[in-house]
Swiss-Prot record:
The active site is at 157 (proton acceptor). This is 1-deoxy-11-beta-hydroxypentalenate dehydrogenase. Optimum pH is 8.0. PANTHER family: 5-KETO-D-GLUCONATE 5-REDUCTASE, ALCOHOL DEHYDROGENASE, PUTATIVE (AFU_ORTHOLOGUE AFUA_3G03445)-RELATED. InterPro entries: HdxpentlteDhPtlF, NAD(P)-bd_dom_sf, SDR_fam. Its EC number is 1.1.1.340. Keywords: Antibiotic biosynthesis, NAD, Oxidoreductase. Belongs to the short-chain dehydrogenases/reductases (SDR) family.
Length: 270
């Protein structure tokens, strides 16, 4: 059953997928708290949506700071009352195109601070209150196809997205049997300010590009459902197949099963 949200919180909302999510939710009539560390960009985003009649509130916050995230939660619940949807969307690309041993450690830590730890802080601040409300709600974690598909030169970004996917899977198990649904958004290439100018990493396969609005529509269609993985790009099956078939081939070499009996990602079975 589709969840028709009346309230929502979106992180990383100043641009890209976060802005598109905020716009999609507001368009459907939801009151939205939009948060980002980029104060000027956030102010412009809120002004743009408000000019079209959206009920949106800006909260500038550094989500890598647990205390700031708790303050965000206090503000959001105080402004909105019960919250139906939390889009845990903040993210950065960080250094790409360098082998792991060449990436400055402080830059790698900075990527994890946003792509993993900020998501952990948001989940810890919001999920207990979502549970306390006893109402149906939905937590959407923005990961990436890089949570599955890894190319050369993506050590920081891909590893942080793997960690975020693991956290989302754990949250889904933790919240099983409760009114709180969990989904993980795994977009491929999306045309956003964060990704413009980037080239595909060496050894990467697939390069279809979608708009941020298309990613937001995919999230909207999943709200209230038990759909955990939200894949957005047309090449997702091919890219995942390339990765997982490689795993099956390695397992087959170790005699765990034969090539003929190994699972197939491209199987026509549901």
């Amino acid at each position: 059953m589709h969840l028709q949200p009346s309230t929502a919180v979106v992180t990383g909302a100043a641009s890209g997928i976060g802005f598109a999510l905020s716009a999609r939710l507001a368009q459907a009539g939801a009151r939205v708290v939009m948060t980002d560390i980029a104060g000027d960009g956030l102010a412009g985003a809120v002004e743009e949506l408000a000019a079209h009649g959206a009920d949106v509130t800006a909260v500038v916050a550094d989500l890598t700071d647990p205390a700031a995230v708790q303050e965000l939660a206090d503000t959001a619940f105080g402004r909105l009352g019960d919250i139906d949807v939390v889009c845990n969307n903040a993210g950065v690309v960080g250094p790409v195109g360098m082998p792991l041993w060449s990436v400055p450690l402080d830059e790698m830590h900075a990527v994890f601070d946003v792509n993993y730890w900020a998501h952990v802080h948001v989940a810890r601040a919001f999920v207990p209150r979502l549970l306390d409300s006893g109402r149906p709600s939905h937590l959407v974690q923005t990961a990436s196809m890089s949570a599955f598909v890894v190319g050369a030169g993506t050590a920081s970004y891909a590893a942080s997205k793997h960690a975020d996917l693991a956290a989302a899977r754990s949250l889904r198990a933790d919240l099983d049997g409760t009114p709180v649904r969990v989904s993980v958004l795994c977009p491929g290439r999306v045309d956003t300010p964060m990704t413009r100018g980037l080239v595909a990493p060496r050894n990467a396969t697939g390069n279809t590009t979608i708009s941020a609005d298309e990613a937001a529509d995919a999230v909207w269609n999943a709200l209230g459902s038990d759909r955990f993985y939200i894949f957005t790009n047309a090449d997702a099956q091919t890219r995942l197949g390339d990765q997982f078939n490689d795993v099956w081939r390695h397992l087959a070499r170790e005699k765990y099963w034969t090539e003929s009996s190994s699972p197939s990602v491209n199987s026509s079975r549901p």
